[in-house]
């Protein structure tokens, strides 16, 4: 019985993964960084500026506590797994 209890405790601790923090790509360097405590959402924000036709959309990557508010003309994609927000490929 003690062995079963010990096994359940070990499995519970492994499943809880206490202290886990998300890693997201962050601009301007597009490097993977550990997000601060409480910020478990990765986001990719894209928008066009005056030079969008020649150089493509502007991109902002980062961590957030909640998915950022969507504004007109701005596309936001949010996700919650490690490095799920890579720099978008130009089309």
Swiss-Prot record:
Q: Which family does it belong to?
A: Belongs to the three-finger toxin family. Long-chain subfamily. Type II alpha-neurotoxin sub-subfamily.
Q: Which UniProt keywords apply?
A: Acetylcholine receptor inhibiting toxin, Disulfide bond, Ion channel impairing toxin, Neurotoxin, Postsynaptic neurotoxin, Secreted, Signal, Toxin
Does the keyword section mention Secreted?
A: yes
What cystine pairs are annotated? 24-42, 35-63, 48-52, 67-78, 79-84
UniProt subcellular location:
Secreted
**InterPro entries xrefs:** Snake_3FTx, Snake_toxin-like_sf, Snake_toxin_con_site, Toxin_cobra-type
Q: Name one Pfam family in it.
A: Toxin_cobra-type
Function noted in UniProt: Binds with high affinity to muscular (alpha-1/CHRNA1) and neuronal (alpha-7/CHRNA7) nicotinic acetylcholine receptor (nAChR) and inhibits acetylcholine from binding to the receptor, thereby impairing neuromuscular and neuronal transmission.
Which Gene3D superfamilies does the entry mention?
A: CD59
Q: Which GO terms describe its cellular component?
A: extracellular region
Where does the source fall among the domains of life? Eukaryota
The UniProt entry lists the main location of this chain as secreted
GO terms (molecular function) for this protein are: acetylcholine receptor inhibitor activity; ion channel regulator activity; toxin activity
Q: Which residues form the signal peptide?
A: 1-21
Question: What is the name of this protein?
Answer: Long neurotoxin OH-56
Q: Which organism is it from?
A: Ophiophagus hannah (King cobra)
> Which tissues carry this protein?
Expressed by the venom gland.
């Amino acid at each position: 019985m003690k062995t079963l209890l010990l096994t359940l405790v070990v499995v519970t601790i492994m499943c809880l993964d206490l202290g886990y923090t998300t890693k997201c790509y962050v601009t301007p360097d597009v490097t993977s960084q550990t997000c601060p405590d409480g910020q478990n959402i990765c986001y990719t924000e894209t928008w066009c500026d005056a030079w969008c036709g020649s150089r493509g959309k502007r991109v902002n990557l980062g961590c957030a506590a909640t998915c950022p508010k969507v504004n007109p003309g701005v596309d936001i994609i949010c996700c919650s797994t490690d490095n799920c927000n890579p720099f978008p490929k130009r089309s």
